């Protein structure tokens, strides 16, 4: 499928026209809402932003600084509001452009699979000789699970998301043949939405609660995902059927969704066991309400009469059983729909769902109670699916296959994927919290006076013994410290949820900072005490280690080997189907050792985990904890999947959908479809196409690059005493920590140490201050030293040979190419001139100048070396769409940075001044605007 320069020019012109149209409407709204003077101020700053890049930069810089210093806080707020609105509209225009390009290509090449689509993956598998039986075996146990997370720096509110969705629909209408009144009416509706946006608080006035974050996450399920999933399965079935026409395909529900909102309590004291229960109730209600609406619609469609077409005996028996559960409904149906048995069945399903919904909202989940769902209510997805399959089999056996494969089949797919719980909630907690809780419990029980003083071997022996001991360790009534009570109550809440409310609502306990086998045995003991684990009988909760520092990634297989030597852990794993989930943390590893070293540590860890699984015959399910920003493992998801080590994915994978990129990936239904199909495409190809491990020469080169990069990164971040003050003073980290952005604190502990700072605000702060340091620092030094000072990195050959080696790796090794391209992208979003203005916020200018000089030198080195390795003249020459997008945004981003710097200066100079609250509001607006403009947060 060719994409000619003519096509690209047409697409670029259409995008420019859309942005111009929206920008003109926004200008009119600014005049109308804020006045002509405000409009002229915005225009002057925008003009200076352009001159800063393309005209007289020194003069523009001086005037921008002078104007920022003289503006009132009220004027600054209006300007930032205008730029925020512009970025929202530009982002929407770019999203719609992607929609239109996809649609144009489908229209132009209807018989050619879209690149990176499901059909393209199946065609490639067929071309490579992969037999249908191999694909079927892969599908039978496949699990692809995107996991939605909240994000402390995601400032978009649900009300804004809904307005953007309406704007998207209106913009899409303009691609049709609109004339006269209809076109004018469309323009007025768009303007109406822009006015409404202008008059709406675009960021939160009060700090969001965890439940607010759950509601925000549910928006994407309710507004698109429920409807989207059946189409994706139809596309997969069609691709398989047409490419392998002789095989009878079974396509199980390989796609499932997960969530962290309400379950991730690591470092967030606001996520309590009661909040987790509330989140589960909300997600269960969302799924059930959606199924009720779907079954009502299905009832309208299934009006077949037994006088016209027979039904199965199985359906009649099912209806008789339903009538015994709902006699009043049965009487009503006998009068109203005596011959329409499918409608009768739909009515009973609806009644069961309503009863299930009532129970989900009101059921007591106190631990230790023996309540169960009322008669006629569904408990699991299987119960609902059993009823739906009864109708399906009856239709299939009575000449109505086309009906069975319509709306009913769609509802079956929705029930398979979303069940009665929408998404499976992960429970994440720091290993130290489990350790501290057990130390108190063991001491109180007289088992061990000081558990924390034990070495790893002693801990393992003690925990194994206690797990195997049938006597309760923890009494029913909890008389411990509040922290310990909360840890125990969390496991008890999970037990109550799984036993009495929703058996699929929670599946995994993720243990942050796992360092040894005892860190997995500790929650297993707590699970046993809550009734979630009975050796040799059942285990209802998987234990997933999270390896997130460079050192922990390096020994990840050793930790699991230690677990496998323990009979009690092997028994737990057997009860979980010999599936071992392991989460790999991209964020903290990057903060720990730097971008390049973290990428390589993660790659190596995956190879070790792959080999571990093969040695023990265990299905490994790797959970990739990627952030949206490059400094936290971000970038295109499908490219990242294909860049993983050969054989490391298999057919099971979990990937985080971080809060800050969910809106971009799932905000519009067609883009959500595109994102999910790209993920499925990548997992199919990575799991089924044979790939060899990279040559030793390449891996040896990466070993050297990683070591050099880590050394250079840590020399700046951890070994210079003046670095932490620089970071605290020249970025808005202090303000980000205080403002109403997310429910979670910015640090795990109340310290100034980089080690204790969460990775998200770490990356976010550098992005806001235009340094973007976590996404590239150390890489330039490593590349340059490897190529031009080979003797320092033990590399052989000449500089020309070593550069040629890196160029070959870039061309032929997807892992290395993705690593370089992601760094290139984040370098393209950096601006060291504006970063130098942030550096002026530091009280100690001599120390700040020294730090900034090191950062600038590394930026120049990284830019230069990446251009050489990728064989391009300018950064992003090989990504022109992104390059143009950045160029289009800079005239608006740059003035906002100047205004943010001025606001930070004023707030820090007079933290208790009369304008304190207004300045904080303006800073929050600027944070939101810069995040939208840069299209990266944390």
UniProtKB/Swiss-Prot annotation:
Active site per database record? 151, 591
Q: Report the catalytic activity.
A: oxaloacetate + phosphate = phosphoenolpyruvate + hydrogencarbonate
Which GO BP annotation is one of this protein's?
A: oxaloacetate metabolic process
Q: What class of enzyme is it?
A: lyase
E.C. designation(s): 4.1.1.31
Q: Which family does it belong to?
A: Belongs to the PEPCase type 1 family.
Checking HAMAP family in the record gives:
PEPcase_type1
Question: Which domain of life, per UniProt?
Answer: Bacteria
**Annotated Pfam families:** PEPcase
- Annotated InterPro entries: PEP_COase, PEP_COase_bac/pln-type, PEP_COase_Lys_AS, Pyrv/PenolPyrv_kinase-like_dom
Q: What does this protein do?
A: Forms oxaloacetate, a four-carbon dicarboxylic acid source for the tricarboxylic acid cycle.
Classification via SUPFAM superfamilies:
Phosphoenolpyruvate/pyruvate domain
- Output this protein's name: Phosphoenolpyruvate carboxylase
Cofactor(s) recorded for this entry are:
Mg(2+)
Record lineage: Bacteria, Bacillati, Chloroflexota, Chloroflexia, Chloroflexales
Q: Name one GO cellular component term.
A: cytosol
Organism of this sequence:
Roseiflexus castenholzii (strain DSM 13941 / HLO8)
Entry keyword set: Carbon dioxide fixation, Lyase, Magnesium
Q: Which GO terms describe its molecular function?
A: magnesium ion binding; phosphoenolpyruvate carboxylase activity
